[in-house]
UniProtKB/Swiss-Prot annotation:
Belongs to the ATP phosphoribosyltransferase family. Short subfamily. It is an enzyme of class 2 (transferase). Keywords: Amino-acid biosynthesis, ATP-binding, Cytoplasm, Glycosyltransferase, Histidine biosynthesis, Nucleotide-binding, Transferase. One of its GO terms (molecular function) is ATP phosphoribosyltransferase activity. InterPro entries: ATP_PRibTrfase_cat, ATP_PRibTrfase_CS, ATP_PRibTrfase_HisG, ATP_PRibTrfase_HisG_short. It comes from Burkholderia cenocepacia (strain HI2424). Catalyzes the condensation of ATP and 5-phosphoribose 1-diphosphate to form N'-(5'-phosphoribosyl)-ATP (PR-ATP). Has a crucial role in the pathway because the rate of histidine biosynthesis seems to be controlled primarily by regulation of HisG enzymatic activity. Its main location: cytoplasm. This is ATP phosphoribosyltransferase.
Amino acid sequence: MTAPLTLALSKGRIFEETLPLLAAAGVQVAEDPETSRKLILPTTDPNLRVIIVRASDVPTYVEYGAADFGVAGKDVLVEHGGSGLYQPIDLNIARCRMSVAVPAGFDYANAVRQGARLRVATKYVETAREHFAAKGVHVDLIKLYGSMELAPLVGLADAIVDLVSSGGTLKANNLVEVEEIMAISSRLVVNQAALKLKRAALKPILDAFERASQNGG
């Protein structure tokens, strides 16, 4: 008996916005990860299961073959490097942007012009390093895993690099967006060996995902 395909997803927005794509492939997830304690979820297709992992771990599970394919944000893939992954489809879901934000009243442009060395808090250290290096901005990067908006408020950092959707959280914490680094959406990533060895099983799902993403879900 052939082992079922394994799809790696993270809880939250990516999971919710992937459900219509699965539905387009005729598949429904049998349990809700927000209420279930299970990390391996069955689907209505006996040949497909879903594993729930941290968003930042999706590329690793797919790269090493623990999952055949997965859905990951561009932010995660850029930081990971994307080695060993086939990225056939931009699913156009979980859209947002990665930006630099500073406290309201902080003259970021002037600080950059004067060559000031800035402390920047982010969980996207590699992406931030490349961005600031390309612009010739001197920074000390501080890696945090959450609550980025707090860092400038307590004097830990001059600026943050984080994901922004509506900007409401920034505004609530008296921060302003000063620079967009890149637009973010979620991509389908496929293990390269699985693409060769399990192509017959994968192709109908990948095709359905592509059609649904082009049609807006």
